[in-house]
Amino acid sequence: IQPAYQFIKNILRNAPDMKLDKDHLMVISPDEGGMGRAIYMANNLGVDMGMFYKRRDYSTIIDGRNPIVAHEFLGADVKGKDMIIIDDMISSGESMLEVAKLLKDREARNIYMCSTFGLFTSGLEKFDKAYEEGLFTKVLTTNVVYQTPELLSREYYISCDLSKYICLLYT
């Protein structure tokens, strides 16, 4: 199930001034693993896409993983454009917030972070702070995982309902 339609529908409901053209909008993959999702959404919207390459230190292992030393952006100029970052999962959210910061540093306008699975394993404090600092506009995740009342109460959060699509799998 591709949640792209639900993400776009909910973004447009909350951003009536968004222009769906290549001069005003880009879709971003936060890493090479998410390219398929970003290409799918960008092609359906008829806009450009970009991606971040996670450069890792393969000589070190921390918590069972090679640490990321830099996010390298591959794509067109983002200045003044709205960004839709699409990924499969927000676990701690560190990568998503880092990508949003790098896009803001490049003078992106509004940033919408979309993820099928919003786990927020490190809590919401980092997202609260980033939102207060203007780092992003909205976070959208689907309801295929539990959403805490705390998350649902956030001004910046939008829940995208996939229940009717999940039900179709069982009928």
Where does each model-flagged region fall?
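PRPP-associated nucleotide enzymes
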Residues: 1-169
